[in-house]
A protein has these predicted regions:
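Conserved N-terminal entry element of GNAT/NAT acetyltransferase domains
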Residues: 1-25, 167, 173-175
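Hydrophobic pocket/interface hotspot
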Residues: 30, 34
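Short hydrophobic/aromatic beta-strand or adjacent loop that forms the aromatic wall/cage
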Residues: 62, 164-168
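Conserved acetyl-CoA-binding loop-helix of GNAT-fold acetyltransferases
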Residues: 104-117, 140-144
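Conserved GNAT acetyl-CoA-binding A-motif
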Residues: 119-130
Length: 175
């Protein structure tokens, strides 16, 4: 993956933004993005993929919407049903990662809009996600996308000696 570096032209480049479902060829870029984005502030445990095969087993092609500019992936939105139960198939659980150099350019919002459209097309009735209480920027982003508080798991994690709440949020898909 070519390095995604901060660049004054990032804002202009977003006019070339594309969004599509993930493909096998994206694995390398997505693994690097995970290593960059998920840390103790954004996840209860850093994500460290040991191999491309492991990554593809956990994140098969089509299980993410990826956003890119030219050939570079600058963000993704992963989605899956929370369990294998038939009674849970109307729900997608989400996670979003945007490269730090491409944040606050509307990429996350465009991914979320695309996800809402895809969910409606696929008969999904509810989107949900979890966010650490120590990540106020992510919480504000999800609220700006219409997500509402569903619950709070108090002191759910102990990260670097600090107890952190896990905030549960949801968005209804009107169908």
């Amino acid at each position: 993956m070519a390095a995604l570096m901060p660049d004054e032209s990032n804002m202009a480049q977003t006019s070339n933004l594309w969004i599509r479902r993930s493909e096998m060829k994206d694995a390398g870029q997505l693994m690097k993005l995970d290593a960059l984005v998920w840390d103790g502030r954004t996840s209860p445990s850093p994500i460290a993929w040991t191999s491309r095969e492991q990554y593809l087993q956990q994140c098969p092609p089509g299980s993410q919407l990826v956003a890119g500019i030219d050939g570079l992936i600058c963000g993704y939105l992963g989605f899956a049903t929370p369990s294998a139960m038939a009674s849970h198939r109307h729900v997608y659980e989400l996670h979003v990662a945007i490269h730090p150099s491409y944040r606050r350019l509307g990429i996350g919002s465009k991914l979320m809009t695309a996800m809402k459209e895809l969910a409606a097309e696929e008969g999904i009735r509810k989107l949900c996600l979890r966010v650490l209480s120590t990540n106020p920027c992510a919480i504000a982003f999800y609220e700006s996308c219409g997500f509402m508080l569903q619950g709070r798991l108090v002191a759910e994690y102990c990260i670097e000696g600090q107890y952190v709440d896990d905030i549960l949020m949801w968005y209804p898909i009107i169908g």
